[in-house]
Amino acid sequence: MRLMPLAATALAALALAACSGAEESPPADETLPAAAAAMAEVANVRFSLAVDGEVEGLEIAAADGVVTSGGEAEGTGVITAMGMDVEVSYVIVGEDAYVKGFTGGYQQIPVGDDMLPYDPTVLLSPDRGVAALLEAYESAEPQESEKVDGVDAYRYEIVFDPVAFAEFIPAQGEWNTATVWFDQETSRVVKAEFEQGGATVTLAFDDYDDSVDIEAP
């Protein structure tokens, strides 16, 4: 008679595991090439970049906005200047950037100026962006799949080629290892998280290929 409760407990545990939906992501050599191809086809995307801690070479605390594959971007950011966090609005069209601080109007500056230390147009650049980075990975370990912001996602621990990564994010140090989540349906990147030395850089994407119109102010 004592076997019945034990059997019931075992069955309940199996049922709970099945209901959790957690399963290992597919092999990386299946997912990453598909993801690289999917990201190469993206016309525009909304992104958010958050920096927790000090990241040498990346003089921003946060950034968000919309970026296009044509080299345009628009949004807001928090840059670090003279030890202070300064919120700015920005527009990038081609080789020109326009930045506006808390007061005053937009100032035209070249892309890469200290007033805009991170160029978000790199995200969809065919040579330096997400797609190129995914093609240049050195190793990737599948982990349990999970939901990210309501999206069913495959999760991987990925080591990227350090040279390719240096083109992607100008952070000094060994930042080329990341946890990356891919949309199970579209293979597009949902989120990437980089950690090193107690600091974290989180990059998230949504609203892929919405209608956008970015013009110089």
What are these regions, as identified by a protein language model?
Residues 15-18:
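C-terminal motif of bacterial Sec signal peptides marking the signal peptidase cleavage site
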